[in-house]
Amino acid sequence: TKRIYLEHFGVDEHGLVPIWFAKDRGITYEEANQKYNDGITWKKAAHEKFSTKLLTTSSADFHYSDIREKLKTLLEKADVSIQEKTDAELYDMVLPPNSKHEKAFIRLVVTFVTLIKSSCKSVDEVLRQTKNAGDERSTFIIKNIFQPVYKRYIEELANINQIDFTDAILQATDICRSSHPVKYDYIIVDEFQDISVDRYNFLKVLREGNPPPKLYCVGDDWQSIYRFSGSDMALFNQFSDYFGQTEINKIETTYRFGEPLVSLSSQFIQRNEAQIKKNIHPFNPQVKTELQFCDYERRDYCNVIGQLVASIPLDKSVFLLGRYSFDDYYLSFMYKSVKEGNRFFYIIGDRKIEFLTVHKSKGLEADYVIILQCNKDTYGFPSLVSDDPVLNYVLTKSDQYPYGEERRLFYVAITRAKVKTYILYDRRFPSVFVDEFLHPEKITEESYAKHPNANKKWTRSADNFLLTLYHEGKSIKYIAEKMGRSQTSIVMRLGKLEGKRQ
């Protein structure tokens, strides 16, 4: 039997690993890069020492060659018979059915389809933007994944003679434009913080007339959590720019919760200066609502939740809240679950506790709230998935504050409780939001920094510009801001370029 080893190395054409290699492991980029490349060197040396056959591919092959053909050629030269898997088999391998990775991927695709329709853009228009920006990653994803799905979705709606909610808004707008709409004296809009471009266009058509009907809108920009469904916070925060002379009445009394949660939550949400400033105070100053952070070790996670639930009086209501619908995954191994219609419960001790996503909990309340998995992770809180750079081309640009949407969502989560909110986090990987409350001294600009050019390929002109700034004596921080990349990326690239010149 002939034994052959096939290794895929996750490095680009310059031998550099992706930035998330460091983020997911809680180490610096330099450490992640060095550690991974040391592993590559060791593996190659080991195969050479023991005269074993090693075939290799790298991430660079996906960009500069046909990885499938390269792999096929390598295997054929090594006299390996090839039995290719079907597309369905490959999909199940990459995204196992019902796994959190498959759910996150589906959510990303659905989000793009929703946004492309609500923003009134075409896929071709978005592709032109990605190509003009030199964003190869986003161009590839949109062209090869999102566009075919979007096309098939539109075809399926036509085949079954149905429309979705966005279609209903768009068609209603067209009907109003082409006919003589009813004249209104007043138009009242609730949850106005969630208004999107398509709904704004519909509202604008409804108000056509001389004089236009009076518009009365109610909303809370602190709870604007549907940006990924197309909502545009600028339509709320800059209301008068879109609708003319405006009178603003602030509702600054909360009837649900008291101090210290009122002050803590207000300070947290208003760190983002794009949010409207408000001075929230409780209706009853005697009401107290606590905010408590609870760390855990992974092996004790379910027990910690059980202990918290057991400590809550039996006559008090309790919510379990997750950033994702799969945040209750580990609970399912220890506690019995019960589904009642669209509601989901866990039997913990002698109690039936409802589990909800934070989005579903908006507008609801309980005496006690336990927020799960507030960890520094791709699927943590704040979520890193929802901010995938590919969505920047269809998202509104009204709020550029780092994790602005996630911050509002976290605010919604912690303010569902009337008595106490518990925030659970892995003691090894507390999220940046947890650190902001417990260890504000650890928070720096880099903690929240986003880098618009992080996914762009380094070009010769970019390299020359980098070297020019560096030799002019500019600081690494200045260069990083100027080039839209992280300071770590700049340091690594300089090391690569300076090494070539020696």
Indicate where each model-derived feature is located.
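Active-site beta-strand-loop-beta-strand hairpin of nuclease catalytic cores
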Residues: 1-15
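A basic/glycine-biased coupling hinge at the interface between accessory DNA-binding modules
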Residues: 12, 16-39, 44-51, 57-162
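Conserved RecA-like helicase ATPase core segment
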Residues: 39-40, 44, 197-291
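Conserved helicase NTPase motor core
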Residues: 135-235, 253, 363
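Helicase P-loop NTPase motor core
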Residues: 245-247, 253-348, 361, 402
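Conserved helicase C-terminal RecA-like lobe
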Residues: 313-317, 352, 360-427, 431-436
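Short, amphipathic alpha-helical "recognition" segments used to contact nucleic acids or chromatin
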Residues: 458-474
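Short alpha-helical "recognition helix" segments of helix-turn-helix
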Residues: 479-481
